[in-house]
């Protein structure tokens, strides 16, 4: 039995304590760390039974995805590395048309990391996993020496069940497809940039980090005529569009006036000379589907949390395969530059 089931008593025990090398050595302190924090938030029969979870496989095809998270700072407006580690893998599965079912998680923790902060991370993971409808069924914890890790790094692996009748992939975009984004873009990247306090800029910007299976399911319930679903993480919407254009060997034409950007994000980008299209999102999707289905998809998205600002922002074309062209707000067309180099490191 877990002696730390009394939540208030458990939290009192964490005050002022830090993770030590002994917590990663496999002995009594390791068991205490697991009981005090991880079992308190992730406890379920699959997780606590043995070293590996024994699961019943889905009837149909499965999707598997893994992702590592090293975001800096680990805590930011709208989330933390724990919430992000659930959303990132859940969303990767969702973009394959797969209902997320199970997750595993690995923590690499720096010696001296505050227990209360680790508790906050685990609490966010528990809450987000419940919202996404997934169970954490296996995990591992390692402790690295001071300075060998920056705080805490997390890796999650997810398993999902592919929905019958849905096939989506980056190489399936077709000329004539409408291009949809599920909300205003660039929030997460802008939030992380401001949280680092390198520029002395203050703005009321919150990360869009969110689990998006519910949004994807709503779209699939509305229509199975879908070609591409991608989450616009590192490199933002612009990078994702270039990847799809290359994979499908199609051209992409965007309408700048239709791309939703929050005023506060646009303001920060204006001051720093950044393009919102290249800033990461952690709660936004890019969807490509026949234009006849576009409004149906947007209507379905607007009925869901996290996608009230969904919009049709462009179309897939036969011209200039592999390129992304922008129709500017003054009516001219410009080739969108393909991003390269280090855009914004450690945003996820």
Please place each PLM-identified region on the residue numbering.
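Helix-biased detector of long, well-ordered alpha-helical tracts
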Residues: 1-348
């Amino acid at each position: 039995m877990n002696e730390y089931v009394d939540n208030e008593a458990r939290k009192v025990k964490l005050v002022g304590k830090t993770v030590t090398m002994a917590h990663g050595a496999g002995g009594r302190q390791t068991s205490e760390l697991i009981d005090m924090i991880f079992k308190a938030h992730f406890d379920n029969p699959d997780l606590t039974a043995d070293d590996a979870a024994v699961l019943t496989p889905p009837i149909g095809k499965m999707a598997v995805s893994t992702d590592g998270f090293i975001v800096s700072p680990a805590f930011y407006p709208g989330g933390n590395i724990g919430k992000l580690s659930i959303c990132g893998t859940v969303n990767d599965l969702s973009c394959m048309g797969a209902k997320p079912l199970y997750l595993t998680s690995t923590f690499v923790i720096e010696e001296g990391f505050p227990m209360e902060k680790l508790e906050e991370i685990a609490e966010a993971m528990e809450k987000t996993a419940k919202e996404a409808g997934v169970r954490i069924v296996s995990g591992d914890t390692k402790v690295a020496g001071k300075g060998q890790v920056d705080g805490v790094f997390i890796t999650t692996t997810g398993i999902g069940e592919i929905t019958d009748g849905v096939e989506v992939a980056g190489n399936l975009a077709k000329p004539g497809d409408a291009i949809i984004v599920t909300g205003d873009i660039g929030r997460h990247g802008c939030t992380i940039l401001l949280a680092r306090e390198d520029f002395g800029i203050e703005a009321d910007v919150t990360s869009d980090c969110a689990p998006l299976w519910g949004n994807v399911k709503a779209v699939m319930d509305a229509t199975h005529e879908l070609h591409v679903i991608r989450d616009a993480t590192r490199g933002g919407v612009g990078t994702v569009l270039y990847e799809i254009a290359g994979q499908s060997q199609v051209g992409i034409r965007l309408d700048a006036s239709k791309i939703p950007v929050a005023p506060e994000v646009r303001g920060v980008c204006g001051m720093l000379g950044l393009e919102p299209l290249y800033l990461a999102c952690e709660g936004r999707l890019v969807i490509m589907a026949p234009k006849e289905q576009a409004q149906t998809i947007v209507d379905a998205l607007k009925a869901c949390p996290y996608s009230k600002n969904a919009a049709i922002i462009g179309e897939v074309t036969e011209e200039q395969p592999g390129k992304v062209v922008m129709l500017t707000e003054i009516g001219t067309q410009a080739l969108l530059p393909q991003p390269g180099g280090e855009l914004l490191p450690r945003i996820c």
